Structure formats: structure tokens, C-alpha cells
Amino acid sequence: MPKGGIIGLLTTLAVTAQFASGQLEPDCNPLKADCQPKKALPNENYYIDFTKQTSPPQDWIIANDEAVNFTSNGAEFAYAKEGDAPSMWTGFYMLGGRYDIEMKIAPGQGVISSAALWSDTQDEIDYEFSGNQFGQTPFPPQDGMWAIETNVFAQGKMWDGAATYQKDSYKPAEQFHKYSVEWDEDHMNWYVDDKVVRSIQAKDTPSGFTFPQSPMKLQLGVWGGGDPSNSYWTKQWAGGEIDLTGAPYTMYVKSVSITNKYPACQYRYNDKWAK
């Protein structure tokens, strides 16, 4: 991961909870334009317990026109009607470290729960879960047959995706589990309940792609892959069309814990090094 020409250590800016328009998208892509510096996480460790929140935390941003509720169950992301896509993301970026998310996925055919690291240059490292196992049968699957989808994007291009299967008793829509991503300039690891389920080394990056190497936010949310208005293939991937009579379908996040490998105050792109 390039160190020079990417990080500018400036002053930390206060960011309050706010509502932004749409899904998480860059307001400025530094590969295409000169962009303002972005807030970084200045501390080595960060932890938030959503079960103790009663309103949006000041360092998280909630998508405009969507609702995320905070109760004793944690942050609640409810798919209640066609087009719902409640999500929120950190108001700060990181350039490497470990992210631990304690969550319970939303049930429901075609309902997608996600936890993703996402950058302004459209690098992405994610988890995606289908409430009905992406349409696989029989459902619910036997122990050892639950699949979790993990994906990697580099500058908006998907270069790796795979399903990992849980070997133990695993009921993700009924139980809370800890899902973790560890990422730096050398590797990416995905964990479930502190067990490595997948690993990628930077040296194995395929030709024509770059290893994710830009500061990222953490985004959490649920959306309707099986929305009736979606394309046939999107609905097929998600596990089929959503039964709206069974809504709402809710994903819960109890807590987020972060270990920050490179504490900083702000990130600045001094050139378009990633092009």
C-alpha cells in the first residue's frame, strides 16, 4: 500500500450524526477530481455499543429517507416495504486494521444484510447474507451448509467473490455472531466468531486489478435484493422475490469494535496514485 502521497496528517474535524442522500457513494472520487481531505480515525481503538444508544451516534451517518432505530437489541435495520434500504456508515475512514461487528441478519426470502468496507475510489471488502440462503434448498440448511458471501472490489471492479460455509451449528437470523474483517497492505482475512473463514494475500492480486489500498468507511445495512421491481437475475441471486406480507424483516447490530492500524487525523490524496 503506498504510504507517501496518500495521507496528510491535519487537524481532526468534529463530525455530527447526519443524514445523507441515498446509499453510500463518494461525494468526490479522488481518481477523477481534486477532493477535500476526509476525516480519519485518530485513535488506535474504537468501540460502540448500539444497545446503549437512543439516537444516532455522532460519528455515524444514516442514509437519507431511511430509518435506523436504536433499542435494547442494538441498531435495527428493518426492510418493511419495497424499496427500503436502511443503512448507516462511519463518519471517519481507516487505512487498515480490524473491524468486529456483532450482528444478527434479517430473515426473509431475498432480503440481503450486509457489512462492507467502502472507499471513495470504490474499493470494497464485504460480507453479504441472504435471509433464505440465496435460494438454496433445503432451507434452513443443515449444520455446516450455511453460506456467507464475501466479495472484493477494486476501483469499482469486482475481482473476487466466494462463499464460505460454516462448519458448526449456525443460525444467523436467530443468533448474534461476530463477523470480522482484517485488512492491511499485505492481506485480507474474514472471520466468523474469531475463526478465519477466508484469506487473500496482496501478492495474489490478479493481473489488471489493484489490491484495495484506499481509506475506507464501514457501512452496515439491509436491502431488498428480491424487490419485485428488480431484474430477474438480481432476484435470482438474492434468493427469490420478497414476500412483502411477511415484512418487516430486521437486521440487528449490537456493537462495532475497531482496531486501527494507522491512526491519523485526515486523509488527503496528493496525486492519483491508484489510477
Predicted region positions:
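GH16 jelly-roll
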Residues: 19-180, 186-189, 195-275
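Fungal secretory targeting signals
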Residues: 1-26
